[in-house]
Amino acid sequence: HMPPTEAKRDYMDFMQAFVAEKAKVLVDIIHKHGKQAYVFYDDSWVGMEPCGERFQSVGFDGLIKCVFSGFECRLCAYAKVPVHELRFHPYLFPVGLNGTPTFSEGGTPEKDAVRYWRSVRRALLRQPVERIGLGGYLHLTQNFPAFNDAIADIADEFRTIKQLHKNGAPYVLPIRVAVLHTWGKLRSWTLSGHFHETDKHALIHINEALAGLPVDVK
């Protein structure tokens, strides 16, 4: 599971302290002007891990997490912030991460959206978030009505899931699963990056399996 060295943990602790201190100043400025401050946890999250002991001290109003998989949904929902938002794939770009067409000739973004949603949905049934969204260039969707229809269906399912959670907590088997590794709480529900970036490591497969199972995970 890519265990850290002592030197790396010391460096990360130093960076987390530095980033939290500087970020708090910026968040205070935002709040001073009556606005809310959200953090986008993905492209560059050095020092900003949501399960880190300093994350709450920054005072963010929400966390936005780009998701491919169920464990990423649980990571977002697990963070101690008022609002949790998932940023769905595919992104509204002409090509995907692997260079294949998405919102361009030959692309089938509606199939991509449904495939990712299946992984996300099973996790959301266990633990909810407040909001969902997309990122990229909105005008690219104009020539892909099947994608727009798919997103409308996904949004309806998401609203249903939110309502189910409001009606009551999901059933949980009398089973507690503990995940223990050298990262400790810092890497709760994650390892390093997305599933396709770390799929050679057993921990990410364990996290993804647990993300949608009706068990108590610690």
What are the language-model segments listed below?
Residues 1-218:
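Glycan-processing catalytic domains of CAZymes
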